[in-house]
Amino acid sequence: MTGRRLSTLLASVTAAAAGASLLTGCGVLPGATGGSREPVTVMTWAPDQTRATNMPGMPAMAQTYARWVNSQGGIDGHELRVLTCNEQNTPTGAAACARRAVREKAVAVVGSYSQNGRAFMAPLEAAGIPYIGGYGITEDEFTSPLSYPVNGGLAALLAGHGMQLAADCGTVSLVRPDTLAGDRLPKLLDAGLKKASKRGAVDIPAVEDATEYTTQATRARNKAGTADGCVAAVLGERTQTFFDSFRRLPESAGGAEADDSGSDSDSGSDAGREPIRISSVLGSVGQPVIDRTGGTRSPFEGAYVTGWYPEADDKSWESMRKVVKEHAFADNRVDPTDTGVQTTWIAYTVLKQVIESLDADTVTSARITQALDHGARVETGGLTPPLRWMYEDLLGAPDFPRIVNHAVTFQVVRKGRLVAQKPGFVDVGPTLTNRG
């Protein structure tokens, strides 16, 4: 760890300790007693009510899961107690949630979302607490020996998205956050595009929490050109805002900028222009966004979308939908079509099967970690390939060594629903390991 990284992390942790009493949105879900075995305490965190990405459905799904398993006697006789915490989309908030997990003696952090990996992983590593099934948004989730990811994160999504777009797109404009994490995205998308001998995407950084994106939308359209052009946006919750700006662009682009060769990239007239295809990845565009923006009349109709899991209407989600229907108690935060909710469900599936494999009266973080490191195999009912985190299962890709699930799905919006464009999973492992 560099001195700069260490000092930054220490500053975050110190600030978290000082501000812990101000943390809001934390709670614990009591449940029915699970029998004579000791309760198991875990934590799920996510940002809520912030100006950027919010994931309130993830802690809500964790609480729903606890109500379900506790109504059936707990996990292998253990009552499941779920702590929740608002990560606030800040390093201080993330570190505070992690330190709370340590204080409350959580044996794992499960199915959580944070963009502040450096801030939360250090406290967890110091306490030996495993991080199971994080959303996959940070580098630390794929490098820390105590992280057990259930998907391939943004790396898999972007590489897969490049592969999906390569079949139909000539030039691709990528609109992505102007952040350190966002700086990685163009190379990942290009890895997928170049697998099909396509040139790299035009990189268009954008402020993550902007209220409109007219400038970036204009540039993206101009750069995509008129023949087989595609515009991909990966801006989290602000993706909808971007495509709203994109949809509102005038038919004539007028003052088009020059392209990289110095020639005019748009004649200023859209006569005969073929519609530019739009695209994104799950987490930036999903069924809830499509529903909110008009369903069959949504601007996302026809969009290509790359995901980690099967489409929301797939029968493999039946068990989750049943649990949500019976135990979410009309909590509208728990949307079974939301990618965050789905990730939390899969993460708790991992936790449940690992605890059951222990067959112990007391469950500790060390026992969970040992089980995961020594070959605990988790079946998710077709939501992912079988999951296991032994050394030989790790992809070992540069920057993302702990990826074990390098499968993605290709989807498309048809008649207002996300449906499979291509059946089954697509393996992006070779693309990630061989990228330049």
Show where each model-derived region lies.
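Extracellular/periplasmic Venus flytrap/periplasmic-binding protein
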Residues: 145-270
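Extracellular/periplasmic periplasmic-binding protein-like sensory domains
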Residues: 248-345, 428-429
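Segments of small-molecule ligand-sensing domains
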Residues: 331-341, 352-418
